[in-house]
Design a protein with these regions (language model features):
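Conserved small-residue
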Residues: 12-19, 23-30, 36-38, 52, ...
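Flexible, low-complexity segments
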Residues: 152-166, 299-310, 317, 385-409, ...
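Flexible catalytic loop/linker elements that gate and position reactive groups at enzyme active sites
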Residues: 2-12, 16-20, 24-25, 80, ...
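FabD-like malonyl-/acyl-CoA
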Residues: 211, 280, 305-477, 526, ...
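Short beta-strand
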Residues: 267-269, 410, 488-494, 498, ...
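A common structural junction motif
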Residues: 227-231, 296-301, 487-489, 511-523
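Conserved catalytic cysteine-centered active-site region
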Residues: 26-59, 64, 69-71, 115-139, ...
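Acyltransferase
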Residues: 271, 451-462, 518-608
Length: 700
């Protein structure tokens, strides 16, 4: 049995968690390693693990598995010394650093062996009684979760495994807790990442068709219909055989590859190719989408309208969006519990990069965003998470999909997100701690509302009951009444609604006289009101930030501050002081978002892409466009939506960018498809004679 004393030698055993149908280690690596020793877990997990550890310590390469029938696919753990892994440039998924058994103090003994403290643990898992096979699976899953940077939360709501900056993930697994056979393992993070999950699969289908005219598009639709009809289209995706799944995935891959070729050809010849995107959760669903768009095609082309379905299929026959892609950054308060919960599994390298750049945990306010009982956020916390969510989505679209915006603007504090996300500010992460402690956000325009107290000349003993209300009304009607209600302010003008803020009783009295009903936001913030003007110099100082050495030259930044009389529609100069002044001007005065969108359209903005949590700003822009009767010329796209699946919403966003003929990369879609084709072929062949490994590495 394992040495359970405090003098146990420290372990550094490299672990690789291998799914049943994973690809194999290369022949070159296998040739430089010892022959594989197969160890199966029968009815005693501890004994099998102890044997495996001894074998590794003797220089062996071990494959730990469950006892299964011959050739039956199974999950496997590959174990070898950390030194051997390093010499062969293998990126382990985790390290086994401590193992103790036969003591109710096993966790303390295992931690001592691993040279770790209990405070180092970022995750602890304890199981009372488990059978040997369940113990193996618990071990396997923890290694896999470390490699996926995934924490299993309550209600099967997994999320990213956040850590403090430059601190590795350390986890403990205690089995048969509080018994004489209790055992504990301590696992630490290594450099290996499991490969990204595929954005597309048999239940997330995505096809792109392009053609010069209606006839060409109709032919393409009919051809795809025939190819899909040749597959078993009456089965649910999970009921398809590996061969049928492989054929379906290969069809998607071939389609997207062909589209890329067509786009490249049309780009060199300057010919615009109208493009249809079809999406569906099954073959049957896509066939229904084909039928629907085939029927609608003549009318859509004749009217040059935009076609969209709930499944995400879309078609814009004559888009006018090229050169007019506008990133729109939402304001404070759009973040929601569990946002972006799935993204890290599909973009692991991006999350690893963001983690290296700064404090990702603080950037997304993870403890409140992903906690089991998400807590109410302060204004400062909402501001941080809002900028963080926009920063993440910007990197995802720009780095992964190579989307390049032509314009950028922000709703309210979204202007700060804009400068932070698009390569203008050198160190946007520095603002996280400043926002948490700055009196601007903690007391002046939120919390105690000291700026309001000063403006209203109140004593510390006098109470302020502040609120804001969304009211469906034109701004002129509200402005006409403001002199009668000096403690109520028109904060925001946004399409067919306005935001009224101030003393709750005063606002309610104004609404009563107006004959309108307001929806209370129940959020304490004096942004965009007269009292905020006293904070102008402080806000300017706060946002005076050093700029990147190389600044974006192809993006036109539009600020609401440009609408103010003193700025006379002059574009913001890209220097620290001008940017800070523009944010302060926007922050401290009424925001006319309607005028901002109209100004953007006048400058050439056409396709408004919301870059942040939820789609609240998209809804506002849609209303403004409808009021102005420009829905054919101007469209909105949301990259995220509360209540929807992160990846499904993202794919709908990508689909609309494609049909609007916006240049982008399809590599994130194709990579996952190619991986699946290879995996399904391997599963179908059932000839797993090599040791599987998927070792996407990240820099140490």
């Amino acid at each position: 049995m394992a040495d359970s004393s405090n003098k146990a030698m420290p372990l550094r055993i490299a672990l690789l968690a291998q799914a049943a149908d994973a690809a194999g280690l290369s022949a070159d690596i296998l040739a430089s390693l010892p022959a594989v020793q197969h160890i199966a877990v029968n009815d005693d997990f501890n004994a099998a693990l102890h044997t495996a550890i001894q074998a590794v310590n003797q220089g062996q390469l071990v494959q730990l598995t469950l006892q299964c029938k011959p050739n039956e696919p199974q999950q496997r753990l590959l174990m070898l010394s950390g030194l051997a892994a390093a010499k062969n440039k293998i990126h382990p998924h985790a390290y086994l650093a401590g193992f103790a058994e036969g003591s109710v103090n096993s966790i303390e003994i295992a931690l001592t062996q691993s040279r770790r403290q209990k405070a180092d643990l970022s995750h602890q898992q304890t199981s009372e009684t488990l059978a040997a096979d369940q113990q193996f699976l618990a071990f396997f899953n923890m290694v896999d979760n470390i490699a996926r940077r995934t924490l299993n939360a309550a209600g099967n709501k997994n999320h990213y495994w956040f850590t403090e900056p430059h601190k590795a993930r350390v986890a403990s697994l205690t089995l048969n807790a509080n018994t004489d056979s209790e055992s504990s393992l301590v696992l630490t993070q290594a450099t290996g990442l499991q490969k990204a999950q595929s954005l597309l699969n048999a239940s997330r289908l995505f096809f792109v068709l392009s053609g010069l005219n209606e006839t060409a598009l109709s032919v393409q639709l009919e051809q795809l219909k025939q190819r899909l009809a040749d597959l078993p289209n009456d089965l649910a995706p999970n009921d398809l055989t590996p061969n049928d799944k492989a054929a379906l995935i290969a069809l998607m891959a071939k389609n997207l590859t062909q589209f890329q070729t067509d786009v490249s050809s049309s780009a060199t010849s300057s010919i615009s190719l109208p493009t249809i995107v079809l999406q569906g959760a099954s073959i049957t669903a896509v066939l229904q989408e084909i039928s629907a768009i085939s029927n609608a095609l003549p009318k859509v082309i004749a009217e040059k309208s935009h076609y969209k379905t709930p499944a995400g299929s879309c078609f814009s026959p004559a888009p006018n969006s090229k050169g007019g892609v506008t990133f729109v950054y939402p304001g404070v308060g759009t973040v929601y519990p569990g946002m972006f919960r799935e993204f890290h599994q599909y973009f692991p390298a991006l999350f690893a990069q963001l983690e290296r750049e700064g404090n990702l945990k603080e950037m997304l306010q993870a403890e409140k965003t992903y906690g089991e009982n998400p807590a109410e956020m302060t204004l400062g916390e909402l501001a941080i998470a809002g900028v963080g969510s926009s920063y993440l989505l910007t990197q995802l679209l720009c780095e992964e999909f190579a989307v390049k915006p032509d314009f950028a603007l922000g709703y309210s504090k979204g202007e700060a997100s804009m400068w932070a996300s698009l390569g203008v500010w050198k160190n946007p992460h520095a603002l996280i701690e400043l926002t948490q402690t700055s009196p601007i956000f903690t007391t002046a325009i939120s919390g105690k509302l000291t700026a309001v107290r000063e403006a209203w000349q109140l004593t510390d003993a006098e109470e302020i009951t502040w609120n804001s209300f969304v009211v469906r009304c034109d701004s002129a009607s509200i402005e006409a009444l403001l002199p009668e209600f000096p403690r109520a302010y028109l904060a925001i003008i946004q399409g067919d609604t306005c935001v009224l803020a101030g003393c709750e009783a005063t606002c309610r009295a104004l609404l009563k006289k107006l004959g309108k009903r307001g929806i209370a936001a129940n959020r304490v913030t004096a942004m965009h009101t007269t009292p905020a003007l006293s904070q102008h110099s402080q806000v300017t100082e706060f946002y005076t930030q050093p700029l990147c050495d190389q600044l974006p030259t192809n993006i036109k930044f539009i600020s609401a501050a440009g609408l103010l009389p003193q700025n006379q529609n002059v574009p913001v100069s890209i220097d620290s002081q001008s940017i800070a002044n523009s944010i302060a001007d926007t922050f401290c005065t009424t925001l006319d978002f309607t005028a901002l969108i109209r100004t953007a359209r006048e400058q050439g903005a056409r396709l408004f892409v919301e870059i942040g949590a939820d789609r609240q700003t998209s809804t506002l822009i849609d209303k403004i466009n409808r009021t102005d009767n420009v829905t054919t010329e101007s469209c909105t796209v949301a990259a995220n939506a509360k209540g929807g699946e992160d990846i499904v919403t993202l794919l709908k966003c990508i689909a609309q960018l494609i049909t609007h003929q916006i240049p982008l990369s399809l590599s994130p879609l194709l990579q996952g498809l190619e991986e699946q084709v290879n995996t399904l072929k391997l599963r179908s062949a059932s000839s797993a004679n090599t040791i599987p490994n998927t070792t996407q590495g990240e820099p140490v």
